[in-house]
Each structure stands twice: as structure tokens, then as C-alpha cells.
Amino acid sequence: GVLWFSTWDGINRFNGYDFKVYKARQGNKITMTNNRVDLLEVDPYNYIWLQTYDYRVYRFDQRTEKFEQIPAEGEEEGMRFSSIKILPDSVIWLLSENEGAVRVKTNPKDYSITTQVYATHSRGGNAVHINQVFSDAYNQEWLLTDNGLLKITNDKEEPVSYFVNIQSGKDEPVQAFYSFC
């Protein structure tokens, strides 16, 4: 196996003998917009997911040594991600501070990805901030938000809402959820 390290100057792979540095430089094909990497995660398909200092997320293919920005440029380009959550069923959630989240699913045959945006104005979610994501024993995904719970089931694309305040008034109470077990 290898070890991966995030640094302020790209990511580093250590194979037990040597280090290899991956960072954007003029003339190379690495497309990261910032070399400072604040977070690294690995998914079940052995892709490295990284979040850079400018709150962008990339998927790094260790086989081809290529970086892919997620979501792709143009798709929700302005979203700033603060965390990456990899669920046991290989679904990946990219969470932002106040713009919702992006759900990423990898096709196990060709490793292509599909993304769904769960922003504050879409998919039935009225949450401003998603605090946590997890999947239960039935592979239902739960989003704990500052305005209720959202549940995504295997048979529905739209989430089911619990304890969500749909009123637009600022002084209306909301039920925030922070943790689970």
C-alpha cells in the first residue's frame, strides 16, 4: 500500500521508498485551482477525493493520475464545499457551509459519476446548512440539517422531510439536527 498526505503544496504519495508530489504547475495537466489541500478521503473504488483551500473538490484517479473537478466546471460552479462524506454504499456527499450539498454516485462498472444537487432551493430541501450525512441499515441516506431531517430512499429521488419549517419568516422556530448514533 501507499500513504497519501495533503499539504499546502499539493498532495504527496509515499510508496515506502519515494515520495511523488502532485500539484498544479504551469505546463502540466493538473487542473487544480489551488495547491493547498485541506482534506483527503479515499472511496471504495480507490479514488482519492480532495478539498482544496478555495473550497473546491477534486477526484483523483490513481491509475491514470488525473484530477477531475466535482461538480464539473459550469455545474454549480459557485458552490464552496467544506467537507466530504463517503458512505458505506459508496455514495459521496460534498457538503457546503450554506449552499446545500452535492450527492455523487459512482458507476461500479466504468467508474463514471453522476451528481445531484441538493441546494437550499432544490430537491425539496429548505435547509441552509447540512450538518451531517449518514446511511442506515437499509441504505437510506439521512441529512441532518439546521432545519429538520431529510431522508433519501432507494425508490424515490425526492427526499422525505421531517421537522422542516417551510415558513419564510425569520422568527419562526426551526429544529436543527447535529449528530446521530
Sequence positions of predicted segments:
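Carboxylate-rich, polar loop motifs that coordinate divalent cations or form catalytic acidic clusters
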Residues: 1-181
